[in-house]
Amino acid sequence: VRGRMPTMEVVNERFARNIRVGLFNLIRKSPEVSIGGIKVQKYSAFLREIVVPTNFNIVTVKPLRGSALVVCDPNLVFAVIDALFGGAGKYHTRIEGREFSPTENRVIHRLLQTIAAEYAKAWVGIYPLELEYQRSEMQPQFANIASPSEMVVTSSFLLEIGDSSCSINLCFPYSPLEPI
């Protein structure tokens, strides 16, 4: 299970370039994107690394079996909302103790559509992979895509949008990706 994953490295490089353009087209601000790395780890270990509350998006991975997670840092959600509504990126919102509002959820859905489209483009020529939105959660116990002991492949991307530092984490069960 351990070792380099050259296919995922290529996909992540492409996705980092693609998401920069996709986010610019969405918010008209050019984010800085850097790749945080690829890890193969237990699902429980991945969940422990995520600061809650956060935005867990469960997606179907077509044509593979099973689901994956697209985890958007709340700072990313608020940076996108701020940019969409003409803000300068100076105001920082806190999510603790509340759910996302209907407006915030709509923006999250648009953000996820952008992420899914750019991620599918990153797989072109390698494998015809698509992410299809299922639902969003705020707590990890409701975002089960694998058993706690199951191995997952995680990729993290660090973004700078204005004064905001934020991240996107992608988490896939290892077994469906292994043949690719």
Q: For the regions a protein language model found, what residue spans apply to each?
A:
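N-terminal auxiliary interaction/assembly segments of multi-subunit proteins
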Residues: 1-180
